């Protein structure tokens, strides 16, 4: 039997994961300028995202420019774009499928496949979380590698942006939501319920003797025993 509370918690986490993934995908702060070494005093700070890069001047003015070409971007940026878009689409599909399979909805209430639909929604959430976690972790690894590398100039080093933190949290929310939805349905509990219903059906339909009327088998035995001794 599906746990309604576990499904509700999983669905809310899935929605939060989807919202955070979309915001992290659009934010231009995956990488921010690092103020170390000779770059401590600088008039312009840069931040880069998947779709645009921004320059923040010392006067407080921020200018953002969308990338003029997508094919000219590095391969890791293109892969991150594709994975984040696919993750958002997968999580959106998971939200729709999970609504159909949740116990608190009116869809397929008498169908045995309702719990299976919820499990499918949970699998979509897990796939969406994995697709969102891979590009975030890859960019995080690249930032840390370049930051601690002595071969990279200080002016070319970046720090972790807010979008990466949001992406990690959102992907974890999607993964936890998928696990909750998958484990909220117990196949053993469903089999036992159907078995009990099947066993109880002939007992409920069995006719009971009327008041004052002896059972049929007992009356036949009594008549046989009386006639046998006459």
Swiss-Prot record:
Residues 29-81, 138-162 are extracellular. Residues 205-230 are annotated as: Disordered. Pfam families: PMP22_Claudin. It is a multi-pass membrane protein. Residues 229-230 are annotated as: Interaction with TJP1, TJP2 and TJP3. One of its GO terms (cellular component) is tight junction. One of its GO terms (biological process) is bicellular tight junction assembly. Keywords: Cell junction, Cell membrane, Disulfide bond, Isopeptide bond, Membrane, Phosphoprotein, Tight junction, Transmembrane, Transmembrane helix, Ubl conjugation. Residues 1-7, 103-116, 184-230 are cytoplasmic. The disulfide bond is necessary for pore formation, but is not required for correct protein trafficking. The chain crosses the membrane at residues 8-28, 82-102, 117-137, 163-183. There is a cross-link at residue 218 (Glycyl lysine isopeptide (Lys-Gly) (interchain with G-Cter in SUMO)). It comes from the Eukaryota. The record marks 65 as: Paracellular cation selectivity. Coiled coil: none annotated. Residues 220-230 have a biased composition (Polar residues). The modification Phosphoserine is found at residues 219, 223. GO terms for molecular function: identical protein binding; paracellular tight junction channel activity; structural molecule activity. It catalyses: Na(+)(in) = Na(+)(out); K(+)(in) = K(+)(out); Rb(+)(in) = Rb(+)(out); Li(+)(in) = Li(+)(out). Its main location: other. Disulfide bonds join 54-64. Can form homo- and heteropolymers with other claudins to mediate paracellular barrier and channel functions of tight junctions in response to physiological stimuli. Homopolymers interact with CLDN3, but not CLDN1, homopolymers. Directly interacts with TJP1/ZO-1, TJP2/ZO-2 and TJP3/ZO-3. Belongs to the claudin family. This is Claudin-2. It comes from Bos taurus (Bovine). The gene is CLDN2.
């Amino acid at each position: 039997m599906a746990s309604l509370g576990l499904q509700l918690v999983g669905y809310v986490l899935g929605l939060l994961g989807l919202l955070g993934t979309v915001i992290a995908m659009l934010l231009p702060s995956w990488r921010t300028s690092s103020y170390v070494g000779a770059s401590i005093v600088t008039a312009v700070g840069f931040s880069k995202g998947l779709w645009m890069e921004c320059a923040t001047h010392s006067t407080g003015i921020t200018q953002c420019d969308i990338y003029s070409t997508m094919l000219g971007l590095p391969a890791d940026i293109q892969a991150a774009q594709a994975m984040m878009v696919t993750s958002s689409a997968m999580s959106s599909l998971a939200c729709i499928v999970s609504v159909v399979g949740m116990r608190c909805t009116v869809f397929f209430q008498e169908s045995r496949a309702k719990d299976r639909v919820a499990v499918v929604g949970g699998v979509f959430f897990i796939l969406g979380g994995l697709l969102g976690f891979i590009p975030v972790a890859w960019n995080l690894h690249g930032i840390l590698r370049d930051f601690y590398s002595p071969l990279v100039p200080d002016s070319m080093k970046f720090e972790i942006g807010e979008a990466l933190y949001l992406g990690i949290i959102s992907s974890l929310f999607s993964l936890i939501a998928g696990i909750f939805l998958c484990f909220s349905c117990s196949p053993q509990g469903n089999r036992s319920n159907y078995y009990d219903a099947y066993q109880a059906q002939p007992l409920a339909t069995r006719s009971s003797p009327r008041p004052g009327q002896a059972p049929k088998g007992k009356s036949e035995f009594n008549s046989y025993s009386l006639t046998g001794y006459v």
